[in-house]
Amino acid sequence: MTSTLPKASQPDPSSLQPSARPGAHGRFGRFGGQYVPETLMPALAELEQSAAQAWADPAFTGRLNHLLKTYVGRATPLYEAERLTAHYRRDDGGPRIWLKREDLNHTGAHKINNALGQALLALRMGKKRIIAETGAGQHGVATATVCARFGLDCVIYMGAEDMRRQALNVFRMRLLGATVAPVTAGSATLKDATSEAIRDWVTNVETTHYILGSVAGPHPYPMLVRDFHAVIGQEAKQQCEEAFGRLPDVLMACVGGGSNAMGLFHPFVQDTSVRLIGVEAAGDGVNTPRHAATITEGRAGVLHGAMSLLLQDSDGQVQEAHSISAGLDYPGVGPEHSYLKEIGRAEYAAVTDEQALDGLRLVSELEGIIPALETAHAFAWLEQLCPTLPQGCEVVINCSGRGDKDVNTVAEKLGDKL
């Protein structure tokens, strides 16, 4: 189900301030901020200053762009999904569907864009120990990868339940030389891994850099992570011009914390002719307690250092999230997504576990691409979206990751034994 503001609440495009920098105290409207222990304030200030200096330094941006090309494998292609397009074609036409192939990056997902950028920042700040949280394991693998590349010590915090679901990625991280620390608190998933990583950072802030994996957390992380992922949308904008001579009509991406979606959306936010659609995890259904549809069903609150929309009970306590996808299994969302929803610039929908599985199977069978379960949520929304779109509409979906890591989960759900 789509969650949008009433027509009267649609924003004046001239009032949008997507230029990348948030307002005072790291705010996107009322969202964002720095709700952290005093111990971390100097580290956050250092990170913000170092990032600003780095982006202004041609040596830094030159090295980053060189590694994005030669190590990560960018630019990723914009692929015309001809059979998926044909599947949704109607007698009166229908949209043309394109995939931004972030699954073709080194390590198999978009996460490497941010991990690489932050590792270079850590080197610039003289930090030799890296920590990170991970849910599906893709951010953990990306972080372990860049730590191996630059000779940095690496500790990845991962919920015990996610370690069970993503055993392949756990092995990959360890093979890359990282220590994977299981977290058994709470639901033993991404929220709990993030909390444990923050505790580590508070204790070891002088020597350690925390490579936060999404556009969440205290300022400057939502801005920092978004800026490292904005290469996705920057490439897509140029590729759309080359492929069909104009901007796309619709951009769509899955949303957990929201980094892949923000990376795609951000370069288009001021292009108000382009619809931005984020797809969340409805789990067993948004009418049940077992879902992760934070924007669709959440209320404003504070989690992991920032104010954003959260899943909460009637007492304001953060609720446990559920999704078949470990990467979307999070009760919060990046504050800029909350802001884009509140001002009406972006739309957000939610699809169930079963719908996501159907989307994964459809794309696998029609395009020969096995997407990650996270990405499959965006594909699943095509079922509701496409009948509403006119002939000639150009739709770009961020194929944020490949599905190798999810084969065991999918097989289990489909009743197959490996």
Swiss-Prot record:
Where in this protein does the record say N6-(pyridoxal phosphate)lysine is found? Answer: 111
What the entry lists under InterPro entries is as follows: Trp_synth_b_CS (IPR006653), Trp_synth_beta (IPR006654), Trp_synth_beta/beta-like (IPR023026), TrpB-like_PALP (IPR001926), TrpB-like_PALP_sf (IPR036052)
Which pathway does it serve?
Answer: Amino-acid biosynthesis; L-tryptophan biosynthesis; L-tryptophan from chorismate: step 5/5
Cross-referenced PROSITE patterns: TRP_SYNTHASE_BETA
Compositional bias ranges of the Polar residues kind: 1-18
Q: Which NCBIfam families match?
A: trpB
What is the annotated role of this protein in its UniProt record? Answer: The beta subunit is responsible for the synthesis of L-tryptophan from indole and L-serine.
- This protein's name: Tryptophan synthase beta chain
Species the sequence originates in:
Synechococcus sp. (strain CC9902)
- State the gene name recorded for this protein: trpB
